[in-house]
Amino acid sequence: QKRIDDGIISGWDVWWAMNSTSESDHQIVIVTLVENIEDFNNNPGIRSVFPDWSDEELEEFNQKNQAARTIIKTDLLAIKNRAAKQDSIPNVLVMNYMKVKPVNALAYEKMEDNYKKSNFENSNRASWGMAKRIDKYGTGLGWNYMTFDLYNNGAELMNSRVNTYEYPAELAKDFEIRDMVYSQTYVKWMALRKE
């Protein structure tokens, strides 16, 4: 919270992977939000949060922190588009991993923007976003874009998936510009913003 209040980051979320177990490839996703990409590595360290701690206390904290988790991977994304019907952070997050040929990137972003404009307000999603992966680049990546669907509860998500739709031919053609590689659902554990 202190890093948010000090303006170092703008948000910090912890999401639990729905239906994950100890055998799953991961159980938790931590999302750190920054306003400017230059701020991403602006981390003054744990001592700035606990300035009165001794070196021994800091070392003990770092050892416990490292022993309590295994970081599987990190990804760096830039938000390209978003929409929200409310100020609060919804409780359910769906991360949709997309693969788009670099030559089709701008057309894909425009397609998502048009789809958002025509469908978001009438959907049961509380928030939506699209992000571009910026830490790695190239056709060999498994995914390079992500869309986020956020719902207030699991029932809204499940109800959105029950119906099977026949897409209009033009929209179906637009969707061919990307492959939806996979989707992962998460439940909010905590979401911190400026107080």
Label the model's feature ranges.
Residues 1-195:
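Short S/T/G/P-rich N-terminal loop/turn motif that feeds into the first structured element of a domain
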